Amino acid sequence: MLIDQFGRKINYLRISVTQRCNFRCLYCMPKIPFDYQPKENLLSFEELFLFVKAAMDEGIEKIRITGGEPLLRKDLSIFIKMISDYKSDIDLAITTNGFLLKDFAKDLKNAGLKRLNISLDTLDHKKAKTLAQKDVLDSVLSGIDEALNLDLKVKLNTVALKNLNDDELISLLEFAKSKKAQIRFIEFMENTHAYGKLQGLKRDEIIQILSQKYQIQLIKKDEKAPVSIYKADDYEFGIIDPHSHEFCDSCNRIRLSAEGLLIPCLYFDEALSIKEAVRKGDIKAAVEILQEVLRNKPEKNKWSVVDNETSSRAFYQTGG
């Protein structure tokens, strides 16, 4: 079991397998990323798996594969199969923008993937092009349908933004309901490349908009995550509300970047590298680094909108 210095059980590992993305979403990535790592700096899937296997043995129970856009990493399904073959009951998921999902969903399911989160911020082609900086909506919708047709469990992630998609929240909820998928509205989280450029909606503002048509009722608050589950009449949806609800006291996660940085907190600059250890095959050293990262995990994150504080590390480097 992995326990940090504040008594929190750490059982959730988020792995960014690539910094690259085929979108340039306004809230995440600059038009021309300046800090992509060369391929030789990235851990191979075999090297990543050496650490992941040890982390599961130590107590990791949940793994999420992120990016950048994880489907841009060649042979991702092989990595998924490595993990699911080693521990078939691991809670294993992917977060994707869905653009390439129609082509890869079947391989991912065959490799052992059971669920995924797909970003969907708008149902309007013009807005989608504005947000992603390219024409993406038809491909994303096709990816959603393909995943659902394969009986993969799908959740839709929507970043709620003022003057961009605030007039679509009801239609997005109804779209998700029609697909029998849960939608989660996400409060915009300020980060290095988007600070001051966008304004997000807070939880109460999201509820106020949805209440124009539906009776909204809180039914579940997960203290292990920044998500609250609500009902709009008979449909359940989520709101991820890091602005409105601080969940640091029960944080259960750490992050691993594609180049091997083990990161204790999304909004914390300090990180330790496992690259040298795994490339030497030194699992004991990698586990010692894991334990040190837990000792370094802060009680609270450094995120402060008031003081204009965010981590200097961009979200596409750590998986958000």
UniProtKB/Swiss-Prot annotation:
Binding positions for [4Fe-4S] cluster 1 per the UniProt entry: C21, C25, C28
PROSITE patterns: MOAA_NIFB_PQQE, RADICAL_SAM
One annotated GO molecular function: GTP binding
InterPro entries in the cross-refs: Aldolase_TIM (IPR013785), Elp3/MiaA/NifB-like_rSAM (IPR006638), MoaA (IPR013483), MoaA_NifB_PqqE_Fe-S-bd_CS (IPR000385), MoaA_twitch (IPR010505), MoCo_biosynth_MoaA/MoaC (IPR050105), rSAM (IPR007197)
Binding site for GTP: R14, R64, T95, K155, R253, I254, R255
Cofactor note: Binds 2 [4Fe-4S] clusters. Binds 1 [4Fe-4S] cluster coordinated with 3 cysteines and an exchangeable S-adenosyl-L-methionine and 1 [4Fe-4S] cluster coordinated with 3 cysteines and the GTP-derived substrate.
Named cofactor requirement(s): [4Fe-4S] cluster
Reaction equations catalysed: GTP + AH2 + S-adenosyl-L-methionine = (8S)-3',8-cyclo-7,8-dihydroguanosine 5'-triphosphate + 5'-deoxyadenosine + L-methionine + A + H(+)
Residues involved in S-adenosyl-L-methionine binding: Y27, G68, S119, M189
Binding site for [4Fe-4S] cluster 2: C248, C251, C265
UniProt-listed Enzyme Commission number(s): 4.1.99.22
Enzyme kind, highest EC tier: lyase
Keyword Nucleotide-binding: yes
Pathway named in the protein's UniProt entry: Cofactor biosynthesis; molybdopterin biosynthesis
Top-level division of the source organism's lineage: Bacteria
Keywords, comma-separated and alphabetical: 4Fe-4S, GTP-binding, Iron, Iron-sulfur, Lyase, Metal-binding, Molybdenum cofactor biosynthesis, Nucleotide-binding, S-adenosyl-L-methionine
The Radical SAM core domain, residue ranges: 5-225
GO biological process: Mo-molybdopterin cofactor biosynthetic process
Family annotation (Pfam families): Fer4_12, Mob_synth_C, Radical_SAM
Job description of the protein: Catalyzes the cyclization of GTP to (8S)-3',8-cyclo-7,8-dihydroguanosine 5'-triphosphate.
Quaternary state and interactors: Monomer and homodimer.
Family that this chain belongs to: Belongs to the radical SAM superfamily. MoaA family.
Protein's name in the database: GTP 3',8-cyclase
Protein source organism: Campylobacter jejuni (strain RM1221)
